[in-house]
Amino acid sequence: MNCSPPGSSTDTERQSSSSGTPVAPRPTLAPTHPLRQANRLPIRLLKMLTAHTGHLLHPEYLQPLSSTPVSPIELDAKKSPLALLAQTCSQIGKPDPPPSSKLNSVTSSGLSEKESGRSSSLKLGESPLEDKSSFKPYSKGGESRKESGSSSGGAADKAGFRVPSGSCQPFPHAPSPSSRVSSPGQHCDSKNNESQEKKEPEANKANSETSQVNPTLTRASTSNSSAESSQSGDVTPISKADPPSLGSGHVAPVSPYKPGHSVFPLPPSGIGYHGSIVGAYAGYPSQFVPGLDHTKTSLVGNQLPGTLGLPGKPPSSSPLTGASPPSFMQGLCRDPYCLSYHNASHLGSSSCSTCVHDPSALKSGYPLVYPSHPLHSVHTTLSSSVTPSLPGHPLYTYGFMLPNDPVPHICNWVSASGPCDKRFSTSEELLAHLRTHTALPGADKLLAGYPTSTLGSAASCHLHLPPAGPGSPNTLPGSLSLRSPHSLGLSRYHPYGKGHLTTPSGLPLPSLPAGSYYSPYALYGQRLTSASALGYQ
């Protein structure tokens, strides 16, 4: 198949060779001539193939079609079900446009982006009046406000929670807000002080609105690079280089990956809060809550970023950044009975058992507030806030291994009267003490009903029951009449098991002592005591 036009030189040579008579050559067309280009075979094939495809939907189905449709089917291409479905799918995730037109929606979205960009350039004390500071967890990094840093590179945009306007506004639960503004414990700038007086009613309104939603979410994740190294000699819990200028009612965050200050509110040290503070902080013993000394935060600022930081990751890449102590400690160890803390060697000191009676501030080396069991917090709330209810160090209520502790083994049993918290020097004494807690009423009669001694020894081994005998001092008197050998499962609760415990109709179901529960760790006493010594990774 020849791709050259009829007037080319190849046709002339073929005709002269076939007929033998010379033929006058035709005038040769230039290669770029339109007539010659139109006769080329690829152009012809493309025209033939595209002649009957005008009625099909174009790939760009959302674009306006040509003004001269090839076929009448193309007239309703925008109204076809496939095109409507494609348009609907393309609108998923977009905000609802106003009823006027799409052009207005585009311009309004552009204006809202400008407004958010303008508000991001404002400082904390200069927020506009129309901003109600609602909690926006999905706000982008550009929409969060910039912190007013003292140094040049000390402030940066940080995606986090929106803070109520003004960095020094009073917490609504604390009394006398006007005295809080003029207290010497707040190193606010003059600009922030002026804006505070103007915006105090709005700050109270916004703060109360936000705290009604969730009191634990009214905190800001601030980023400052110079707050760790610069510490002043004041007695207030802030340093002079901190941008947010938090008052004495705010506690430094227990975030191991980034130094700085979070804004979860607590009462100042002058206010004698007894027991727990508000809902989310009920798990904290009252003697640690009232204040933190910023000169004692060496563990938060220096030790934890080096020891707990993940290798190869920047300090701000952790999901725990800026978190409050409950989520931080549950993220590190999700077990409420966790017996060790793998940085405990930095925490131990020779005077650890003598520094627990000061409710105003934590002593040196103990800036962290460890969460305790909820039952223990109830017991601590009922007890005096000045005299701790624990014989040992109250930060380590569940057997934290201190290197200089002469009696490191602590009983973790919690009942209605509070935690036991007795200390023992050896694990054998602790296990012998645990058997007094786990003794079932009438256990001697229960074990005496079985003929084989192997079953009784296995039950006393796994359930920590005392050996059967009439003179056993640990057993409690009581009637325990059970009909099936499944009664050994009395100490455990099986949610999916069948009800094997059938009692006679005249006898009530025997139960454990009132108010106490069976500790799952009583079965693993040896493992726990050895794990606390080994670090329990």
From Swiss-Prot:
ZnF bounds (C2H2-type): 409-437
GO molecular function, one term: zinc ion binding
Residue stretches of biased makeup (Basic and acidic residues): 188-203
Compositionally biased spans, kind Polar residues: 101-111, 176-185, 205-220
PROSITE patterns: ZINC_FINGER_C2H2_2 (PS50157)
Subcellular localization(s) per the UniProt record: Nucleus; Cytoplasm
Pfam annotation, one family: nlz1
Identification of the protein by name: Zinc finger protein 703
Organism of this sequence: Xenopus tropicalis
